Curated annotation (Swiss-Prot):
Keyword RNA-binding recorded: yes
Protein name per the record: Small ribosomal subunit protein uS5
GO cellular component: cytosolic small ribosomal subunit
Record organism: Methanococcus maripaludis (strain DSM 14266 / JCM 13030 / NBRC 101832 / S2 / LL)
Keywords: Ribonucleoprotein, Ribosomal protein, RNA-binding, rRNA-binding
Subunit note: Part of the 30S ribosomal subunit. Contacts protein S4.
Gene of this entry: rps5
Taxonomic lineage of the native organism: Archaea, Methanobacteriati, Methanobacteriota, Methanomada group, Methanococci
Length: 225
């Protein structure tokens, strides 16, 4: 499922009725850049905010599984969908949704992924390259979810994404073009694998750099182009 092509959806801003103050400011045009919301630490409570500010966002279904849980009346089955969204230019999110039907489960996962959207730091942290362009990640990062642990390493230009299909989908929609990965644990669990990769990308944002280091690494946050 991870190799399914990403899709874009058109969003009608005029038909949208915001429920939050930030949503109303976005519709009125007071806020026109999603990085402003993230830099201020404002909460993303409506997926439509992401649709309005990132019209080039793509969605990719990584996995749909039938899961069961025991109840006093017997086994209850639901579908669990794992989705990644991103614009291939510095923004990415991962989400999961559950429902009795496949369609609603995917829609819930898409909404969850949009609300978990983060800015991604890109750069050139490989000692083999040093070109200073934002094609890889600026430094090594680690992430974990459940039993799965993922380590991302900068790679020189042209290597591509040396990763499993799930991690490759997350990194690709984040805008990372070259990277090496190390994985530990049960990576067959799609959501944990995707979330661990997402966690590693998010951890890049907590590393402090001096201005001269940022220039050397070609470090860029959010949109590159």
């Amino acid at each position: 499922m991870a190799e399914k092509r990403a899709e874009k959806r058109k969003f009608n801003t005029e038909a949208w009725e915001p429920k939050t103050q930030i949503g109303r400011m976005v519709k009125e045009g007071t806020i026109s850049d999603i990085s402003y919301i993230m830099d201020k630490g404002l909460p993303l409570l409506e997926p439509e905010i992401v649709d309005a500010l990132l019209p080039d966002l793509e969605e990719q279904v990584l996995d749909v599984k039938l899961v069961q849980r025991m109840h006093k009346s017997g086994r209850r089955a639901r579908y669990r969908a794992t989705v990644v969204v991103g614009n291939k230019n510095g923004y990415v999110g991962v989400g999961m949704g559950k429902s009795k039907e496949v369609g609603p489960a995917i829609r819930k996962a898409i909404a969850h992924a949009k609300l978990s959207l983060i800015k991604v730091r890109v750069g050139c942290g490989s000692w083999e390259c040093g070109c200073g362009s934002p094609h890889s990640i600026p430094f090594t990062a680690k992430g974990a979810c459940g039993s799965v642990k993922v380590e991302l390493l900068p790679a020189p230009r042209g290597v591509g994404l040396v990763a499993g299909n799930v991690a490759k989908a997350v990194l690709g929609l984040a805008g990372v073009k070259d990277a090496w990965t190390k994985t530990f644990g049960d990576t067959r669990t799609t959501y944990n694998f995707a979330e661990a990769t997402f966690d590693a990308l998010n951890n890049l944002n907590f590393v402090r750099c001096l201005p001269n280091q940022k220039e050397k690494l070609g470090l860029t946050e959010g949109r590159v182009l």
